[in-house]
A protein has these predicted regions:
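Structured-RNA-binding interfaces characteristic of tRNA pseudouridine synthases
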Residues: 2-294
Length: 294
């Protein structure tokens, strides 16, 4: 792991929040594991990141968050996220968990949010902090994950949503796309809808709880929203589903084609992988009552 960021590297605008965090006891002084887990709900604009997971030479969400946490807690930390997002993919509700020690329990939630906000750039938003039982995992305790993919099918470029929609610039029939989407609801082998190399030797069955396509309006822009909820998703699964539905929406394939793609269990049978910037990780569902305010 990288060493903890030094105080000299903290921006002047972060000093107040940073000094408040240092006023709390250091976890390094009393490394007694507590019966709690810190869970962070955060959002981010994915445009500037190589993805959530850390990469040696590129900026990542996990890297920025880890360095901020290590500055505040004054120790190394290991993060577990609800779902790894690719480069360019956004999040409104990503969840990250990390074990904490008895010394950490005295940290004020309000001060911790302020410190993490001050120590991260504008494209990361610390939304909320939770306390969960010892051993809780943001990944393995998740019951369902939800994504929204936004498409602008208008001939005019989107303005406010430019970096989080796919400007398709052509007519799409949202009703036909929605009809086709229903064939993917339930438990299926989604091998046709994931990155081929990532499926080698791995299980490709997933359960899709719901999938819908509808016309919406956001910030004055007319968009098509593809909303999907499932227990877990394969690499590029959501974006490949969107790309396949677009083939139907544009009239190049019939609604029934989706059944052929699903049955083929071959990535070549499906449509293209839709661009990353249109995808947003919007929600994670956990067992009721397991997350309590920090």
């Amino acid at each position: 792991m990288n060493s903890v960021t030094s105080q000299d590297n903290v921006l002047s605008c972060s000093v107040d929040a940073y000094e408040e965090s240092l006023a709390e006891p250091s976890a390094a002084e009393t490394l007694t594991e507590s019966e709690a887990t810190l869970v962070i709900k955060l959002g981010y604009r994915g445009t500037a990141f190589c993805g959530f997971a850390e990469q040696p030479t590129q900026r990542s969400v996990a890297g920025d968050l880890r360095r901020a946490l290590e500055t505040v807690l004054r120790r190394e930390v290991e993060l577990t996220c609800a779902g790894r997002t690719d480069a360019g993919v956004h999040a409104q509700a990503q969840y990250v968990s990390l074990p904490v020690y008895d010394a950490d329990l005295s940290l004020s939630g309000e001060k911790l949010v302020r410190s993490l906000t001050a120590l991260t750039d504008d494209d990361i938003s610390i939304r909320q902090l939770f306390r969960a039982p010892q051993g809780f995992s943001a990944r393995f305790d998740a019951q369902a994950r939800s994504y929204r993919y936004r498409i602008c099918a208008d001939s005019a470029r989107p303005i406010l949503g430019w970096d989080h929609v796919w400007w398709y610039n052509g007519h799409l029939d949202a009703d036909l796309m929605d009809m086709a989407a229903q064939a993917l609801v339930g438990e299926h082998d989604f091998k046709s809808f994931c990155k081929a190399i990532s499926a080698e030797g791995k299980p490709t069955h997933r359960f899709v709880e719901s999938l819908s396509v509808e016309e919406i309006e956001e910030a004055g822009e007319k968009l098509i929203a593809v909303d999907i909820t499932g227990n877990a998703f394969l690499h590029n699964m959501v974006r490949t589903i969107v790309g396949t539905l677009v083939e139907i929406g544009r009239g190049h394939r019939p609604v029934e084609w989706i059944d052929e793609v699903l049955a083929a269990k071959n990535r070549i049978a499906a449509g293209s992988c839709a661009p990353a910037q249109g995808l947003t990780f919007v929600n994670v569902r956990y067992p009721e009552g397991i997350l309590q305010p920090w």
